[in-house]
Amino acid sequence: MRKIALFLSLCVFIWASDLQQALEYEKQGDYKKAMEIYKKLALKNSSVLISQEQNNSSEATQMQNSITIKKEEKQDFSRLALANYLGENESFNPLGISSYKMNYFLPFAYSFNSLGVNNNKSEAKFQLSVKKRLFENLLGLDEKYYIAYTQTSWWQIYEHSSPFRETNYQPEFFIDLPLYLKDYEFFNNLRVGILHESNGKGDENLQSRSWNRIYVSTAILYNKFLFVPRLWYRIPENKKDDDNPAILHYMGNFDVNLAYLGDVYFINLMLRNNLKFHNNKGAIQVDLGYDIFNNGIYWYLQYFNGYGESLIDYNKHLQRLSTGFLISY
């Protein structure tokens, strides 16, 4: 704009000088020279107007392009925000924290079995689970190092004072290793981790539960089916300090998740078993989710049958039906 103003000022100065000269010729009676100057001024004025229109057109085009770019940037920002919400874009998240396991709140969780003295069979259940990447490629294998934290709580919200009946805490550290198998592209990752799980209770009431595991897992995606097997080894404890010596008998050494991921819904099946023909123990959990608002918030139904839903109930058979909302899968 500054250049255009200077250019227009120069044109006005030249135009005024020529006009003064034409008027002098006209006073002297030399109408021919005066008309030539008037004609010249008319042509200059026309060219200035054309130039100004072109500049205005150019500015309008630039402004329109700017608006278009801003619109595209806004659309890109929306896509980044959505990708971040789904945990697909860590660069958008300044803390690098993303969802890990399911995050849900189930205000209606009904147990068909007794939950102990003074406990209501109806309660709420919720889970929070996050992870953060620490490092990557330290060994030159494109591996990634994570810490994660999962907390699952069973909350007696329908009782007076609404106490928490049980809360399980799971801090863990794991490494994701990529696998480069040309003939098995759907099998392309391996996870190795160490997991601590406890309910944070003291020994004085004999309700303390904890154990430590080393595990190996993988995730196999084929079309819309996701298969996640996991094997673990319990780190041995001193018998005097072991709060739950028989936990492997009820929890086994593995679990398997098989999911179908639709466009607006998912179905997940979890199986766990001790693989013993005599005195067989295990658990099954079925998860159903439907994106009712098309915004990533799912109506969620959970059915559990077996042992080990929580650490305090690891050796008790429970059958439970729960429903509520899920915000990440």
What do the PLM-derived regions correspond to, one by one?
Residues 1-79:
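Cleavable N-terminal export/targeting peptides
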Residues 25, 96-117, 121, 135-263, ...:
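Outer-membrane pore/translocation modules
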Residues 38, 42, 298-300, 307-311, ...:
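A cross-kingdom marker for long, charged
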Residues 52-122:
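Basic/polar, acidic-poor N-terminal "presequence/leader" segments
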Residues 126:
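Gly/Thr-rich phosphate-binding loop signature of adenosyl cofactor/nucleotide-binding cores
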Residues 130, 301:
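Conserved, mostly hydrophobic/aromatic
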Residues 266-292, 297:
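Glycine/small-residue-rich hydrophobic helix-like segments
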Residues 318-329:
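Outer-membrane beta-barrel "beta-signal"
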